[in-house]
Amino acid sequence: MSLKKLDNPALLLIDIQKGFNDIAYWGGERNNLAAEQSAAELLEIWRNKKMPIFHVQHCSSNPNSILNETHPGNEFQDIVKPQEGETIIRKNVNSAFIGTNLKELLDDAKIKTVVIAGLTTDHCVSTTTRMAGNFGYNVYLISDATATFNKKGINGEEFSAEIIHQTALASLNEEFAQVVTTEFIKRIV
């Protein structure tokens, strides 16, 4: 198995924004602190091979959210900051496909394969991955280039960020996507 430039795989970087650096805001615990570094490695590969890149930016409609466009947390993290000519998709819901032209852009470019990395595993990454799979794209979800935060259960129990992350990945694997690592992708592109 290999992904070649000819296959035109797109890299979707989901919500790698400064607001996610505020761990306390999101629950107090985060897994995989190296996720952005792994995403940056993928981005460098895509840039060097001149393959399509889509930066997805969550623009919360909640004026109090640190991901609202008026807040500095809305900005992309420097490690994956878009360069001139790279497509930015702005969304205000969990899916990068809802209320955006992402599907149209992918289809117009005859892209059949998407590689997904970003934040957070159980929210926007999961929703976008599910929709990409439902739309028929060949989806690779990069486990070490995604991360999430701890959650409180409906009965008040605490779930660690790692448990939430692994459960989200398990729910997506082999149904909506192939869950793989950055190293796996490096070997096949």
Label the model's feature ranges.
Residues 1-10, 37-41, 48-49, 61, ...:
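Active-site-adjacent betaalpha module
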Residues 11-16:
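N-terminal nucleotide-binding beta1-loop-alpha1 segment
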Residues 4, 20-21:
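Active-site gating/metal-coordination segments in enzymes
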Residues 21-33, 156-158:
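Acidic/histidine-rich helix-loop elements
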